[in-house]
Amino acid sequence: MDNATQKKYLSFKEILIYSVGLFGLQMVIFYLNSYQVEFYSTAGRLTTAELVAVPFLILAAKIVSAIFDPIVGNLIERKPDKGFGKLKPFVLYAAAPLVLFTVLLFVDVPISGAALLAYIFVITTLWSMAMTMADVPSQAMSAVLTPNPTERTNLIGFSGTFRSIGQAAPYVVVPVICLIVPGGAGISGTLSVSEYLWNALGIGI
């Protein structure tokens, strides 16, 4: 039997680091999914009719950014390996823009109406592109980190658990951050505009 399929290539620390990375991405995604529209409602800069349009703008932004998916895949394939692998650099490049756009989506910008809707669409599109830049190579890593099929299965299972936890994490992290922020809503109560921003900073970073 091929020794490559029996040898251990990953330490528990490496598996944990990879899993925590996926956890973080899912936490950011689900924070936006759960609180983005609610934030705009709390900010009070959009009419009811305009608020109804926001989910459709978010969907349109994600559709536009979906065009970016195969482009990222092609860039990964064409990138020469300079010792860091083909996938890791893309995740690193995406980190800062992803944090930036996550924060910008929860900034109470002093505009309203069509201008604010345009802002939401543009920043959500850029956020989705940054997320694609991070998520596509992150998902692909599980297939290339080890040629050992048993180890790969364990990696996928372990990281999958962290992904699932990350999806639920905002519902725990948000109240905790609100407890820390002076005058925050805490465990219960309505979040203020500034608390959405503090949570975006905390979860994004």
Give the ranges of each region predicted by the language model.
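Membrane-embedded alpha-helical bundles of multi-pass transporters/translocases
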Residues: D2-I205
